[in-house]
């Protein structure tokens, strides 16, 4: 498989990692009246890409290049993810990705990562094994950060899929910029709003999405 094919496969929403059950905070944002249509969805996606997307991609890029050991990467992710619910969601998605990765690369020492690693840590190892360039691995993570929330909003608000796709096309340049920034070094930021949404969603009775 070429690196481009790997990139497309990892960015495919049909990848069987369980990511489709996570909304990235958009369900709670809609419930709170913060996202009501396309304009507010675009604003939310920009905010999420610039914070969570950048953070996840930067840690993955460091693991990918071998600059950050997996134990250190796990601790760095915890330190940059204040909300327990957000940490749980990250580890849940990491578990889904590592389950798939074990099937694709069965002899690659996955035990080192433990049973529930953060998504960024697994993604960094996967990127290195698959032959992706670090910037392309970062881009795929930024991209799925955006599209995961966009697709969830489309379902929850019954938005026109074509209109939502237009929004994601308009944010493609931002995704490229954030991916480049992620490869420059570890991001050191969090977003209190996204952390609050994650915690409130975790307390919700029978939500449609896990996070």
Curated annotation (Swiss-Prot):
GO cellular component, one term: cytoplasm
Keyword hit for Cytoplasm: yes
Region (Disordered): 71-93
Broad class of where this protein is predominantly found: cytoplasm
Keyword Glycosyltransferase found: no
GO-annotated molecular function: nickel cation binding
InterPro entries for this protein: UreF (IPR002639), UreF_sf (IPR038277)
Compartment(s): Cytoplasm
Keywords, ordered alphabetically: Chaperone, Cytoplasm, Nickel insertion
Top-rank lineage group of the source organism: Bacteria
Pfam family membership, one: UreF
Subunit structure: UreD, UreF and UreG form a complex that acts as a GTP-hydrolysis-dependent molecular chaperone, activating the urease apoprotein by helping to assemble the nickel containing metallocenter of UreC. The UreE protein probably delivers the nickel.
Biological role stated in the UniProt entry: Required for maturation of urease via the functional incorporation of the urease nickel metallocenter.
Protein family according to the UniProt entry: Belongs to the UreF family.
Protein name stated in the entry: Urease accessory protein UreF
UniProt gene name: ureF
């Amino acid at each position: 498989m070429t690196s481009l094919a790997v990139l497309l496969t990892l960015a495919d929403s049909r990848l069987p990692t369980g990511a489709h059950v996570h909304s990235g905070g958009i369900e709670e944002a809609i419930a709170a009246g913060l996202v009501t249509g396309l304009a507010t969805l675009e604003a939310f996606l920009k905010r999420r890409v610039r914070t969570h997307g950048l953070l996840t991609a930067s840690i993955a890029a460091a693991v990918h290049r071998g600059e950050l050991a997996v134990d250190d990467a796990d601790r760095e992710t915890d330190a940059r993810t204040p909300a327990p619910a957000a940490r749980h969601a990250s580890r849940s998605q990491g578990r889904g990705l590592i389950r798939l990765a074990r099937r694709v690369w069965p002899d690659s020492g996955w035990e080192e990562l433990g049973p529930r690693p953060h998504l960024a840590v697994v993604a960094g190892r996967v990127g290195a094994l698959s032959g992706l360039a670090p910037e392309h691995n970062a881009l795929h993570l930024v991209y799925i950060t955006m599209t995961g929330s966009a697709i969830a909003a489309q379902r929850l608000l019954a938005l026109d899929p074509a209109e939502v796709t237009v929004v994601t096309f308009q944010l493609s340049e931002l995704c490229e910029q954030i991916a480049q920034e992620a490869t420059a070094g570890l991001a050191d930021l969090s977003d209190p709003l996204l952390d609050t949404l994650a915690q409130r969603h975790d307390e919700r009775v029978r939500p449609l999405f896990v996070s």
